[in-house]
């Protein structure tokens, strides 16, 4: 289903929360043409056509109960807090605990996706959905009994699984990889780095982004969804703990 049709079909739909409260999503006011121009000027490139279409329809979807929060925001565009991972991002949703679902925005973007879950506890990056339409459908599923599906899997299971997994490949093991991208990326990184190839990720796949503390160095192979993180000594981590640097 197209994103526009999904958004229109969501408005007015009855949802049942975890506390058995009934909520109804409503469309926010559309974003003005002047605001869209302002967003594109800030980005330095045109908004993806699908996003522009949605913004002229509604700035987002909100619920009748303000305490439940705004589940979907189509206009939340800013620089990613992890600039070594993503540049400009749309944050369509947060979990209320400081963790965000984000979509990287790029010039000439045909698909408004994928959607990633950026979590700080544990500090991981997790693949959520291939596009915003799928994410919205999954989010609606999560907001209705039995409250299951990909969103619940990522929040309740994948974060822990990604934090504890050992699938990240030491940079030294890819110096002579048959994959040109991985080989070039590995040779550009210092010793002690680990690489995670998420080009063909499935919901729940991901990479720890704070394996060696809050200042863990991160890198990305150009525009590809191939990421890496560097190791830090115990002394370096202790310095960060006491000084924040």
Predicted feature residues:
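A surface-exposed partner-binding patch
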Residues: 1-111, 147-245
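Compact, glycine/acidic-enriched structural inserts
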Residues: 113-150
């Amino acid at each position: 289903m197209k994103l526009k049709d999904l958004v229109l079909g969501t408005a007015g739909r009855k949802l049942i929360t975890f506390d058995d409260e009934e909520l109804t999503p409503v469309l926010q006011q559309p974003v003005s043409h002047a605001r869209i121009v302002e967003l594109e000027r800030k980005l330095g490139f045109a908004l993806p056509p699908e996003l522009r279409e949605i913004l002229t329809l509604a700035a987002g979807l909100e619920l009748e109960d303000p305490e439940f929060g705004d589940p979907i925001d189509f206009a939340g565009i800013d620089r990613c807090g992890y600039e070594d991972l993503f540049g400009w991002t749309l944050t369509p949703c947060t979990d209320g605990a400081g963790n965000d679902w984000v979509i990287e925005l790029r010039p000439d973007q045909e698909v408004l996706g994928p959607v990633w879950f950026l979590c700080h506890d544990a500090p991981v990056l997790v693949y959520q959905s291939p596009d915003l339409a799928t994410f919205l459908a999954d989010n609606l599923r999560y907001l209705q009994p039995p409250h299951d599906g990909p969103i619940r899997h990522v929040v309740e299971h994948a974060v822990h699984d990604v934090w504890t997994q050992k699938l990240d490949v030491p940079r030294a093991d890819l110096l002579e990889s048959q994959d040109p991208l991985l080989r070039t990326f590995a040779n550009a990184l210092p010793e002690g780095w680990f690489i995670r190839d998420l080009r063909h990720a499935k919901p729940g796949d991901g990479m720890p982004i704070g394996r060696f503390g809050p200042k863990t160095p991160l890198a990305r192979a150009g525009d590809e969804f191939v990421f890496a993180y560097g190791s830090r000594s115990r002394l370096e981590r202790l310095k960060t703990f006491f000084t924040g640097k």
